[in-house]
Amino acid sequence: LCRQIVLLKPKALILFEINELALYAIEKQLSNINTHYSFKIYPILGSVNNKKRLKNLFQSFNVDTVYHSAAYKHVPMVEFNTTEGIDNNIFGTLNCAASAIESGVKNFVLISTDKAVRPTNTMGATKRVAELILQAFSMNQNITTFCMVRFGNVLNSSGSVIPLFKKQIIEGGPVTVTDKKIIRYFMTVTEAVEL
């Protein structure tokens, strides 16, 4: 997502991430791309569960648009860690959206999932609740425009099943599938961020 935003030549790009290594890696990649452009990249460590930090960040940088993609998205992991999934995916979204309104952010885009449609697992349910939070905020204020996009299976993203399948094949199998009758649809990372 950030690599695509860079191509739009923003005034500044604020990267807000809880994972130090992930933040370091993306900041380095974007800094290399940014040699062709002239805008600032700010790598900021933090959690969407720290509302005070979010509000301060949005106000300090006069943020115009938020792309909220912070989520726990590995279905089995969220099933095993339900409380953390709820805390991050639901309350993190609530904090981020409320901070956006309080800070006068114009646009807020939630990155959601196709698993939020008639959810059958905790991760899908938490993302559906996150969508409902934005819908409620949209009806009760006119400061921030909220929208959301549901991604399906994104090839080679951090949540993709493809690396797991590759590993299982290299190791001689078996390839684990949840349901032999299921049909999976995939999109590339580029296709996903262009939505």
Residues of each region from the PLM?
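Aromatic pocket-lining residues of Rossmann-like dinucleotide-binding sites
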Residues: Q4-I5
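Conserved Rossmann-fold cofactor-binding substructure of NAD(P)-dependent oxidoreductases
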Residues: Y42-T65
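Helix N-cap at the beta1-alpha1 junction of Rossmann-like dinucleotide-binding domains, i.e.
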Residues: N19-A22
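NAD(P)-dependent short-chain dehydrogenase/reductase
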Residues: S31, A98-I101, T122-L195
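Conserved residues in the N-terminal Rossmann fold of short-chain dehydrogenase/reductase
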Residues: I44-L45, D87, D179
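Conserved Rossmann-fold NAD(P)-dependent oxidoreductase catalytic core, especially the SDR/UDP-sugar
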Residues: H68, Y72-E131, A136
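Hydrophobic/aromatic anchor residues within beta-strands of the central parallel beta-sheet
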Residues: P43, G85, F108, F146-V149
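Proline-aspartate-enriched helix->loop->beta-strand connector
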Residues: P10-K11, F58, N62-Y67, V75, ...
